[in-house]
Amino acid sequence: MNRLKEKYNKEIAPALMTKFNYDSVMQVPKIEKIVINMGVGDAVQNAKAIDSAVEELTFIAGQKPVVTRAKKSIAGFRLREGMPIGAKVTLRGERMYDFLDKLISVSLPRVRDFRGVSKKSFDGRGNYTLGIKEQLIFPEIDYDKVTKVRGMDIVIVTTANTDEEARELLTQVGMPFQK
């Protein structure tokens, strides 16, 4: 069993239960899934860009991402409907906990001038979104093989009903929020 999942079951869930006075164990918020999305805007001109993004996301997440395609044509962006414009991967279960553990303990401390993640990135429904400016913070990415520095969005979806519950859950997991 993953270190983070073990910690959740033994320490975090009982602590949340006492703090929020839940009647049942099933009411305790837990992390449902993590979605990593990488938008590749230059894939419109350069078809090879999407391949490198897919490869990098595979290394980061440990599973093959889905190529996202344009829903509508937008003439201003020279975009046609159905063109590949990004890649996303949804992590659940064991891989999700592995990724979150790696993100908190290894990758985030490698960000330049890191002072913690924003407390304001909750969506009102208990989900947390985190933007990363460069993929180089992940140890799986080889610096020499990177053609272009790309950012990504990481969405942590929880079963929490409010932002306060989700914030407490992520704080207990070890997410380094700004003071």
UniProtKB/Swiss-Prot annotation:
Pfam families assigned to the protein according to its UniProt record, in alphabetical order: Ribosomal_L5, Ribosomal_L5_C
Cystine bridges: none
InterPro entries: Ribosomal_uL5, Ribosomal_uL5_bac-type, Ribosomal_uL5_C, Ribosomal_uL5_CS, Ribosomal_uL5_dom_sf, Ribosomal_uL5_N
Keyword annotations from UniProtKB, A to Z: Ribonucleoprotein, Ribosomal protein, RNA-binding, rRNA-binding, tRNA-binding
GO biological process, alphabetically ordered: translation
Residue ranges crossing the lipid bilayer per the database entry: none
The keyword Phosphoprotein is annotated on this UniProt entry: no
GO molecular function, one term: RNA binding
Presence of the UniProt keyword Ribonucleoprotein in the record: yes
This protein's GO CC annotations: cytosolic large ribosomal subunit
Role summary: This is one of the proteins that bind and probably mediate the attachment of the 5S RNA into the large ribosomal subunit, where it forms part of the central protuberance. In the 70S ribosome it contacts protein S13 of the 30S subunit (bridge B1b), connecting the 2 subunits; this bridge is implicated in subunit movement. Contacts the P site tRNA; the 5S rRNA and some of its associated proteins might help stabilize positioning of ribosome-bound tRNAs.
Subunit structure: Part of the 50S ribosomal subunit. Part of the 5S rRNA/L5/L18/L25 subcomplex. Contacts the 5S rRNA and the P site tRNA. Forms a bridge to the 30S subunit in the 70S ribosome. Interacts with VmlR. In stalled ribosomes contacts MutS2.
Family the entry assigns: Belongs to the universal ribosomal protein uL5 family.
PANTHER family per UniProt: 60S RIBOSOMAL PROTEIN L11-RELATED
Protein name: Large ribosomal subunit protein uL5
Organism of origin: Bacillus subtilis (strain 168)
Name of the coding gene: rplE
